[in-house]
């Protein structure tokens, strides 16, 4: 005689996770408006990358803590050298982008100092293909 009741469990089928392609509204960054046009694939990922690079992390309560970057902390620190900033920029950009499940790697960084800003180019490898990104970042950019 058992002290606990015997319970039979039915076999439960585990559903495999299906990753759907992203679909989002296109943002017109020049006019600061969301359009009625839906975008998917690489174009949607490119828009996410742009938003992540233009948004300071923790600055806007509408975004989760996974959205944005912490580049301004390094770029506005006048006690650090340009060499240190060049070393930190790839890490901070990668940290800003890896939260997106569609992005598998951020590679091939090239960074040049131009005046008070840095011209940064890199490659984003995604499940939809590869994106080449060029961006100018700095204190006032």
Curated annotation (Swiss-Prot):
Top-rank taxon, per record: Bacteria
Matches recorded under InterPro entries: DUF2634
Family (UniProt): To B.subtilis YqbS.
Protein name, UniProt field: Phage-like element PBSX protein XkdS
Native organism: Bacillus subtilis (strain 168)
């Amino acid at each position: 005689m058992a002290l606990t009741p015997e319970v039979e469990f039915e076999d439960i089928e585990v559903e495999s996770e299906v990753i759907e392609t992203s679909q989002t509204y296109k943002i017109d960054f020049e006019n600061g408006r969301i359009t009625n046009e839906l975008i998917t694939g690489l174009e949607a990922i490119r828009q996410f990358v742009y938003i992540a690079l233009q948004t300071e992390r923790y600055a806007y309560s509408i975004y989760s803590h996974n959205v944005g970057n912490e580049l301004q902390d390094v770029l506005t620190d006048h006690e650090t050298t340009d060499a240190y900033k060049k070393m930190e920029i790839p890490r901070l950009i990668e940290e800003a982008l890896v939260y997106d499940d569609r992005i598998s790697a951020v590679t091939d960084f090239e960074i040049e100092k131009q005046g008070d800003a840095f011209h940064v180019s890199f490659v984003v490898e995604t499940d939809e293909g590869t994106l080449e990104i060029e961006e100018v970042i700095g204190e006032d950019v």
